[in-house]
Amino acid sequence: MNQSEILEKVKAIVADQLSVDPEKVVPEASFAEDLNADSLDSVELIMALEEEFGVEIPDEEAEKLKTVQDVLDFINNKVAA
C-alpha cells in the first residue's frame, strides 16, 4: 500500500467517523479544532483505523495523534515496518 492509498483510506475513515466533508480532511487538520472531534469520536476513530490497517495503536500513541498528518505518519511507519 503506497502513501497516496493510505491518505485516501485515512481521509475516508476520518470523514465517515466524524461526519465531516472529505474536503475538510487535509493533513494539517486538527481533529479537535478543525474537525470538531470529541473524546468519544477520537476513540471510535482509533478503533476504525486499527481495524482498517490491521495495526494496534496503544493509548499513549493515540494521545499524540492530534492531526490527520499525525495519523498518516503513524500508519505509514507501521505499514512500512
From Swiss-Prot:
Protein modification: 4'-phosphopantetheine is transferred from CoA to a specific serine of apo-ACP by AcpS. This modification is essential for activity because fatty acids are bound in thioester linkage to the sulfhydryl of the prosthetic group.
Modified positions (O-(pantetheine 4'-phosphoryl)serine) in chain numbering: S39
The UniProt record lists the keyword Ribosomal protein: no
InterPro entries the record matches: ACP, ACP-like_sf, PP-bd_ACP, Ppantetheine_attach_site
Pathway it works in: Lipid metabolism; fatty acid biosynthesis
Carrier domain sequence ranges: 4-79
Molecular function terms from GO: acyl binding; acyl carrier activity
Disulphide-bonded residues: none
Keyword terms of this UniProt record: Cytoplasm, Fatty acid biosynthesis, Fatty acid metabolism, Lipid biosynthesis, Lipid metabolism, Phosphopantetheine, Phosphoprotein
Record's function text: Carrier of the growing fatty acid chain in fatty acid biosynthesis.
Locations listed in the record: Cytoplasm
Organism of provenance: Thermosynechococcus vestitus (strain NIES-2133 / IAM M-273 / BP-1)
Organism domain of life: Bacteria
A GO term from the CC aspect: cytosol
Annotated protein name in UniProt: Acyl carrier protein
Matching Pfam families: PP-binding (PF00550)
Coarse class of the protein's main subcellular location: cytoplasm
